[in-house]
Amino acid sequence: MEFNELKGFLGDRFTTSKAIRIEHSHDESWHVPQNIPDAITYPENTNEVSKIISFAYKKNIPVIPFGTGTALEGHTHALKGGITINSSNMNQVIELNNADMDCRVQAGITRKELNNYIKDTGLFFPVDPGADASLGGMCATRASGTNTVRYGTISCLLYTSPSPRDR
């Protein structure tokens, strides 16, 4: 498969290394991977994600999201190869509104990273699925955990609002 366009704008944040592709071919589920992705990308913002998805759409290549790999659902498996989008470089808090008790974050930020960022505000992010999952992964799996009875699941705490300012 030809990936020059992706290599062009991602540089060293694009790889076809077999070892890294194997690492991204599974999560913590019991499912045994039958295939591996063709390429792994590490975008840093939604514009880059959009370019990767546009490229994949034009070439009819499957896209597989990957957070920290701690999911139990098997959704990171590359059933037909494809391009994995690893969100680990998208780990920033974009905006924190202490008065409103909310924030805007990128999908790759982990629960621990977010809680470390907001710890001095008196706020905390209560969803604790047991692993240090990314918030994007938590949203994808509708995560819950040990604090669910008191604070609810990720679905109870989540509001998404895609807009040009998010890019």
Show the residue positions of the predicted features.
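Generic secondary-structure signature for well-ordered alpha-helical cores
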Residues: 4, 8-12, 58-61, 116-123, ...
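A short, flexible low-complexity segment enriched in Lys/Arg and Gly/Pro that occurs
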Residues: 36-57, 105-124
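Short hydrophobic alpha-helical runs that function as membrane-insertion/retention elements
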Residues: 64-65, 126
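Anion-binding (especially nucleotide phosphate/pyrophosphate-binding) glycine-rich loop
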Residues: 77-90, 96-135
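Hydrophobic, small-residue-rich alpha-helical packing segments that form membrane-like cores
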Residues: 113, 131-133, 138-158
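Conserved small/polar residues in nucleotide/adenosyl-binding loops
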Residues: 159-166
